[in-house]
Amino acid sequence: MTTHQCKDYQELSKVAAEWLIQRIRKNPLSKIGVATGNSPLEMYRNIAKTRNLNTKSLSLFQLDEWVGLSEFQHSCMSYIEKELRIPWEIPSERAYYFSPGLTPLDSKIQAEEAANSMEKKLDKKGPLDILILGMGKNGHLGFIEPDENWPSDECYVSELTPATQNHKMISSENTPPEFGLTLGIKSILEAKEILFIVTGTEKKSIYSEWLKKVVTPKLPASILWKHPRVSLITDL
């Protein structure tokens, strides 16, 4: 694991963008798994403003998604459309989402079908070239939540913890989602390279725990210590 220590979020976003730009230029056909939320947001926007960068041939794969939202605009898919696919000028057929259409997944049964469908897409397309990840306040990775045991290796429907249900992304939902869809451990560990972005003062405590290098399902992001090619970029 390589570590890039940054002084603040602005520097972190710049360093992360430069990291990703180098790899896009090396392989314009890269298959990229993308996280949402505040951690990678400015990195995505920096890349959209980069001149002479061909992003049109990239493929995007969604990392996770809420289940049971009342508004599409609160979804991870909406975020990816707004902040990545459209600004990066990537054709819609090269964006692989859990939901078959621009609508929220409204039930656990529908979400389970979507998980199976995404797993088949990943099996067909091969491992991700790059996977962009952040860490939740409780140490989650995607929607792989802290637990006593590791979950399914494949894409699955996760029961969300209260910490995740309080995420700013869904703060205007009257009822927080009970479930989330997420890529599984297999897709994470099979990714050729991982960009791990850790930022936010509220994550200092869990980041300190993560640095102990104890791999445990109680801190899902600890699984990254088993991956051979992780680039950590942090301002903590």
Regions inferred by a protein language model and the residue ranges of each:
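Glycine-rich beta-strand-to-loop/alpha-helix junction loops that act as flexible
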Residues: 34-39, 133-137, 199
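A glycine- and small-aliphatic-rich helix-loop capping segment at beta-alpha/alpha-beta transitions
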Residues: 46-55, 78, 146-155, 213-215
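Ligand-binding beta-strand-loop-alpha-helix segment within the catalytic cores
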Residues: 55-132
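N-terminal glycine-/serine-/threonine-rich phosphate-binding loop
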Residues: 1-32, 49, 95, 112
